[in-house]
Amino acid sequence: MLVAAVFSNAENARKIADSLARYGIRAIAAASGSAVLRQMQAVTLVVCGARLEDMTAPRLRRMLPAEIPMLLLAPGAPQLAGIENLPAGLTRAQLCEIVLHHIGAQEALVARAKRAMIRRGGVDEAAAHRLLQKHAMNSGVSLRRAAEEILQKYGEDESI
């Protein structure tokens, strides 16, 4: 799981990435949306400001796969589809808790897909994980999307 902290001010991006790292969250800092797009396969969540070095948050949202959540740290910004606006006055600790919640939901989805593969595919946990990663890479989708596809394949997608 990799979180991208993307802000036009590179120092702010670094501070947020460092805060996330202190909570045990793998994070990268970037000032541009294009930097995130280059690492799109690895990124599982984006935390960003309204304006980035080379584009706006809504433009980045349109370029990212729908299954990659975007959290917007821009109090007063209009609510847009696919972007979760975070409230004003959020502390770094509160931001980290929100990110952990999102990551936990994704990890639960991946775990469900692995359990389905173990039950129906006759593989062990390590093999299920490798197969899930391979499916994501071969399909060019995120691990979350690959897990959703596996659950759909096995008819266990009712809560997606």
What is the role of each PLM region?
Residues 1-10, 16-20, 46:
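Conserved acidic segment of CheY-like receiver
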Residues 13, 33-37, 42-68:
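Conserved phosphotransfer microenvironments
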Residues 19, 86-105:
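Receiver (REC) domain switch/output surface
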Residues 25-31:
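Short hydrophobic/Thr-rich beta-strand motif most characteristic of the beta2 strand and flanking loop
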Residues 46, 85-86:
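Two-component signal transduction core modules
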Residues 67-76:
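A short, hydrophobic beta-strand element within the central beta-sheet of small alpha/beta folds
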Residues 75-85:
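Alpha4 helix (beta4-alpha4-beta5 surface) of REC/receiver domains from two-component response regulators
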Residues 106-160:
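C-terminal output/effector regions of signal-responsive regulators
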